[in-house]
Amino acid sequence: VKLIRKMGRFCGVEVLTFCVMGNHFHLLVRVPDREIWLTQFEGVGGEERLLAHLSRFYSVSFMQALRWQLGEDRRIGDELAARARLNGFKRRLCDVSAMMKELKERFSKWYNKRHGRRGT
């Protein structure tokens, strides 16, 4: 349940209600207009707001590595690579398919770890 809510907040998808059953689940979601929702990450401070948003979902070590990669891209003068790296994250926001893929992957990892299993 926490994972469903967390994924919804991260992806910008509002989870209205859900039903978790024995071997599957159902979600009722509202997906905002992507163009409008992403405007919060534009303009002055937009990149920092995006990185703060990502840090709610990704580990500290992942975020440190991402910040380092962005710094390296810019240090060598490759602003296009830095923007492409950030756009890869933006593409997954307000996308139900991306949310469901990530949700199922993370649930599988949690379940397998909890029950001492491997695979997907």
List each language-model region with its residue ranges:
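Short catalytic/metal-binding and nucleic-acid-binding patches
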Residues: 1-120
